[in-house]
Amino acid sequence: MKRQLILEDGTVLIGTGFGGEIEKSGEVVFTTGMTGYQETLSDPSYCGQIVTFTYPLIGNYGINRDDFESIHPSVNGLIVNEICNHPSNFRNEISLNDYLKERNIPGLAGIDTRKLTRKIRQYGTLRGRLCNMDADVEYIVSQLKATVFTDHVKRVSTKDPYPSPGRGHRVVLVDFGMKHGILRELNKRDCDVIVVPYNTTAEEILRLSPDGIMLSNGPGDPKDVPEAIEMLKDIIGKVPLFGICLGHQLFALASGANTSKLKFGHRGLNHPVKNLATGKVAITSQNHGYAVEEESVENTDLEITHVALNDGTVEGLRHKKFPAFTVQYHPEASAGPEDANDLFEDFLTMIENFKKEGEELCQNA
């Protein structure tokens, strides 16, 4: 079955279709991970996107029940050079092709993914549509140029609060499109977690008596979530806070900094990040299309703690006055290296220190 990818600049790439027999539009991006395709297609941060894999053969080890980052995949399509229809792995339960058919997600194989990746790197992220061979190219191009993708966070955030009980510190986890890996890391440390929707107010969060607040990853432009920015303005300084990815960007906006769209984003499992305080470099998992503008941090109460070695963009922030820090990358990995996993320990240490300071103030009062 032939299928084509039509880009907003009029480029047409023809290959073999797999997965769901449906036409879908989305922002065409690329990821450089050699593995982790199951985590990628189930990562809510990819909501509304058509993901191109730069590694030439995808699907080798199939799909298993353990590696999902959300219950429902959020990608609008997959593009690969070659798909493996006969996976081999002791955990394999279903092939990637069959899984995408079940979930009605279209795929395209047999195209030059290097050519597509170079185009995205040269011209920036492009809107595209995976469609049948009888599609009207001119009409599709006109529709793509007029399309604006919004409300991604609303689509992937939980609709209702729910608990993930533990005996340790109570952490309110604000879900902007949370990867399950973040929740797993908190559960591993016996945190008493309450997951809440993206539009939960500061008053509602504080009513839960949290020891700490965690801001999850999520899709899209942080400026499309004004309610979260307002919530953070009211909550920063009252409770220890740790943000990841979109949570990092929202924290920056609430603190007076600015964000902007990257030309083609950071997506992959091997991005080097430097800790400016220690000089240490961590290899990190990343997935974002926006970043905090370095110059905008200067006149705020924030300090830059980490930078990307590939392009110098801001990868970490800390508040100068209050117990709050954030990172642009994914310390929970899933998939990817676990070099930055100790940030969860730093978060819990910050909570403990904040509690001790509060107890000392009460004793001295």
From Swiss-Prot:
GO terms for biological process: 'de novo' pyrimidine nucleobase biosynthetic process; 'de novo' UMP biosynthetic process; glutamine metabolic process; L-arginine biosynthetic process. GO terms for molecular function: ATP binding; carbamoyl-phosphate synthase (glutamine-hydrolyzing) activity; glutaminase activity. Residues 1-166, 1-169 are annotated as: CPSase. Pathway: Amino-acid biosynthesis; L-arginine biosynthesis; carbamoyl phosphate from bicarbonate: step 1/1; Pyrimidine metabolism; UMP biosynthesis via de novo pathway; (S)-dihydroorotate from bicarbonate: step 1/3. It catalyses: hydrogencarbonate + L-glutamine + 2 ATP + H2O = carbamoyl phosphate + L-glutamate + 2 ADP + phosphate + 2 H(+). Keywords: Amino-acid biosynthesis, Arginine biosynthesis, ATP-binding, Glutamine amidotransferase, Ligase, Nucleotide-binding, Pyrimidine biosynthesis. It holds the Pfam family CPSase_sm_chain. CDD domains: GATase1_CPSase. SUPFAM superfamilies: Carbamoyl phosphate synthetase, small subunit N-terminal domain, Class I glutamine amidotransferase-like. HAMAP family: CPSase_S_chain. This is Carbamoyl phosphate synthase small chain. It comes from Bacillus cereus (strain ATCC 14579 / DSM 31 / CCUG 7414 / JCM 2152 / NBRC 15305 / NCIMB 9373 / NCTC 2599 / NRRL B-3711). The gene is carA.
